[in-house]
A protein has these predicted regions:
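Extended, well-ordered protein cores
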Residues: 46, 61, 66-71, 83-86
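A generic structural signal for well-ordered coil/turn residues at beta-strand boundaries
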Residues: 42, 66, 119-121
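General detector of N-terminal leader/presequence modules that precede the first folded domain
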Residues: 1-64
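Short acidic-glycine loop/turn motifs at beta-strand connectors
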Residues: 42-43, 73-77
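Broad, structure-driven detector of short, well-ordered beta-strand segments within folded domains
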Residues: 38-39, 70-72
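Hydrophobic residues embedded in beta-strands of well-ordered beta-sheets
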Residues: 45-46, 79, 139
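Beta-hairpin (beta-strand-turn-beta-strand) motif
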Residues: 51, 75, 86-89
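Cys/His-clustered metal-coordination modules, chiefly Zn-binding fingers
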Residues: 85-156
Length: 156
């Protein structure tokens, strides 16, 4: 997919809370009520794109520190993150990618819940090489039935 990513599809960079407020105001009320696709680029900055965007496109085809979906709520005159996940089947980020998300949000002055509100555990099956989601702590490949490794193994 990376070769097909055009530079104009990269997500909106959010350096400050005002950047977020402007971008969300451009989205409209119904779209702003949905979660958005996000990545934290290698420069540590948050990038946002509409929910149905591919994470790889949001990142401009580059590697990332974190990826997932993020939802916002407005309260006390400002936008805050009320839900955030590492749900990205393109990048399959590990749970420790939260640290990059928190740093990007803190840097921009955007309040957040302090963790992923919904965590997804990804692993690559060493036997069949498929990407799998670990459900309910069951580290078994849904494709071939082999045991999945306990440590994250989906680095680019």
């Amino acid at each position: 997919m990376r070769p097909t990513v055009r530079p104009d599809t990269a997500g909106r960079i959010v350096r400050a809370a005002d950047d977020l407020a402007v971008w969300l105001s451009e989205r409209g009320q119904s779209e702003s009520a949905e979660p958005f696709t996000f990545v934290v680029a290698l420069d540590g900055l948050l990038r946002l794109a509409p929910r149905r965007s591919e994470h790889v496109a949001c990142a401009g085809g580059d590697d990332v520190l974190a990826a997932g979906e993020m939802g916002f709520r407005r309260g006390s005159g400002r936008w805050t993150v009320h839900e955030v996940t590492n749900q990205s089947t393109g990048y399959c980020p590990d749970l420790d990618s939260w640290h990059a998300v928190a740093r990007a949000l803190d840097r921009a002055g955007i309040d957040h819940p302090g963790r992923f509100t919904h965590e997804i555990v990804f692993r690559r099956c060493e036997r069949c090489q498929e990407r799998s989601v670990v459900r309910e702590g069951d580290f078994v490949c849904v494709f071939c039935g082999s045991a999945l490794p306990s440590a994250w193994n989906l680095a680019p």
